[in-house]
Every structure is written in C-alpha cells, then in structure tokens.
Amino acid sequence: MKYTILICLMLQTFFVISQKKNQPKVINSQEKLEKMIADLSKANESQVINWRRHLHQYPELSNREFKTMAYIAENLKGLDVTIETGMAHTGVVAVLNTGKPGPVIGLRADMDGLPVYERVKLPFASKEETEYLGQKVGIMHACGHDSHVAILMGTAKILSAMKNDLKGKIVFVFQPAEEGAPKGEEGGAELMIKQGLIEKYGIEVMYGLHISSVTEVGTITYKPMGAMAAADQFSIKVKGKQTHGSRPWSGVDPIVVSAQIILGLQTIISRQTELTNEAAVITVGKITSGVRNNIIPEEAEMIGTIRTLDTTMQKIIHEKIKLTAEKIAESAGAKAEVDIKIGYPVTYNNPQLTAKMLPSLEKAAGENNVRVVKASTGAEDFSFYAQKVPGLFFFLGGKPKNVDTIDASQHHTPDFFIDESGFILGMKALAQLVIDTK
C-alpha cells in the first residue's frame, strides 16, 4: 500500500513540474518596458539613420541652424508631444506629458556643425560652404551632432509610443551652438538656461550623450564627477617696436617675443602644474602679425584655449599665464596684454545619480560593455545644465569594430567618421534611463 502511495506522489510531482515547464514565462512590467524599448529601437533604426544622413548632408553653424530646427520640428509633428521652436535662436524643445505624476526628465542633443571641409567619401557627405571669419569654409558635422539629434528624435518616437506605460514628463532638448556662439552673440546651453528652460519646463534631472569616434561601437563609457574639462579662452597681445627687417636691433620684435611666450606657456603645464592630480592643457591655436617680409611689425597677437578639470588648478594656471607672458615680454623690452575669458565649466556627473543609473546603462549595453574612463580634456556646455540640476553625461561608442583605436578618425577633423550601427544603443540607453528614473 505504501508503495502505491509513493508512486502516486511521484507521479503527481512529475505532473506539476511538467505543467510549470509548459507554462509561458510571466513577464513583469519592467521587463515588458525593456522589451518594448529593444523592439522599438530596432524598428526605428533605419529611420534614425536616414534622419542622420539628411542632417549630415546639410549641416549648419552655431546659431544658424534654421533648416535643422525646421527639420526636427517637422519630423516630431506626428508624435504625441508639444513643440516649441526658436529657444536660444534655433533650439527645439518637445515635451511628452504622460498626464501621470512622476519625474520631469530632460534629454539633450546638440545641433551645430563646424567650419570644416569634409574629406570622407560618403554618398551623403556635406557639400555646404559659407563665409566664416572672412574666409570661405566648408561646413561639416565633424563632431557627431547630427547623430545626437537623430538618436534623440528616435528616442522621442520610442517614448511617445510607450506613453501609456510612462509617468511624469520627458523634455527633449535640441540645443544649438554647443561649439560656441559667434563673436558678439549669446547661445548654447547657457542661453537656453538664461531663457528659462529649466524653470519653464520644471526639469529635475538631465541626461545627455556624445558619440565617440575612438571607442568601439556597442560600448558606453562614463566617469563620475568631473568628466570633461572646463574650457577658457585667452588672447595675448604683444606690443613691440616696429623697424626695418634688416635692422632688428633698432626695434623690438613682437614675433620673436611671442614665440618665447608660446614656449613659456607650455612649461606652465609640463613643469609648474601637478598633473598627478588632474590633466591640464594650454594650446595656442592662432597667431597673427605683420604685413610684409621686410618689416618687423609693431604688434603680434595669439589666441588659445585652456583646459582644466579642477577649479583651484584653473585659477593658478590663469595667474601663471598672465605672469609668464608679461615677464617674458618685459625682459625683451616689449609689453604683453593678457585677456582670459571664462568659458564652459567642468562637466560634472552627479556621483549619486551616476551610481543610481549605472544599472540602466548596463541593461542597455550589457554589463561588460559599460566601463569607467579617465576624464576628457574636451569640453561640453552640457556642464551648464549639470550646474542647475543633477546631470549624467556619457559617451556612446561609434568606432567600427574592424578599426584600431590608433587609426580611428578624430573629432573636429575632415576625416571624422561614425559607425551608424551604434545608434540603436543610444536610443536604448536614453529610453532606459527614462523608465528607471523615479
């Protein structure tokens, strides 16, 4: 009898186990949203690539992104968003209001191109030209802002389709002039904030990404706290004494003095700055002087950039630039006038927000495809948003897998190139951050 009971119990257990195996897996609401994001990202990939190629072919410079603004607004019209154009001259702000209580999340993409002739042989390569600082130049999306816009448009399409499953508001910020407004004009993130972007829309947290031509497609890199450098501009005007080119001893040559100053500036970094703390850079990007081969001119002027990742270091380097230029000029009988303009602050990733949202990036890319990197000496005006609300800015891999990092094209060059297969991850990451922000 007891054997009969035992056999019955075994059969019953086997039946229950087999029934469980045959039952479909129950998907919770979070898994459902993640699957929707993955499916919609894949479904919208070709559209996003087409958007990017159009934008790449017709780039516009800072504060002149009128066609770009119209293109973005036109392609957002079919979505369940309200659209404002013209903020900070040519910006676009689209709001997805779910109608349910929840966080107000800002997602930002920059829009402007650069005065660069494109050298990459693409069927959608830029052929745009314009006048810039008195000379004819090409216009190119040589920093990937076309990719950022297309990815954010795709993210807006995905989240609009998921509206019934979301809470709060999502503010899609298409920002002009990240590369810097023309001389005498305001622009970029600073102007958007000045015009009330954060307060008007009630933004509580801000996310942004930047495509990278030197990190592998399918990866995400980030750094907590100081992620990108502060960028300041300087000009040094050297006043000498004009004379005949054959008689330099009868004048004071501002070109030679300028050369000595340029070398002196580099010793500020290599010999006077504790680089074990943070990186720093001083670069002279332009020097102008003279009109003829046989005239030693009266003046020379140089302009350049300063990159720092620490406010104390920033202050010290500013002081040393002034002291170095003035004393070198004085030693040669010349005079140096130094002007330093404060630019973008350090791009600061809120450490609490970064730690909290890291799992979201890992869900999107896979845990092994997300890694911490050292700070970049590049600069970003996303930093202004991160001064107002907690922010997280990360890098999206865009380097083809078959290209070595050393051979990858650099940003701001005629050869800049992006692997478009990385756009899916960009959309997934931004959308995942939205659904995980509570």
Enumerate the language-model features and the residues they cover.
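Extracytoplasmic/secreted proteins, especially bacterial periplasmic and envelope-associated proteins
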Residues: K32, A43, Q47-N50, H54, ...
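Metal-dependent amide/peptide-bond hydrolase catalytic core
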Residues: K25-S29, G78, A259-K438
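Divalent metal-coordination and catalytic microenvironments
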Residues: L55, A94, L107, H145, ...
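Bacterial Sec-dependent N-terminal signal peptides
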Residues: M1-Q23
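Acidic/His- and Gly-rich active-site-bordering loop/insert found
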Residues: Q19-M140, A150-K167
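Soluble non-cytosolic domains of exported or imported proteins
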Residues: E31, K42-S46, P59-A70, A142, ...
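Histidine/acidic-residue-rich, glycine-tolerant segments that coordinate divalent metal ions
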Residues: E129-M140, D146-S147, I158-K286, V291-I295
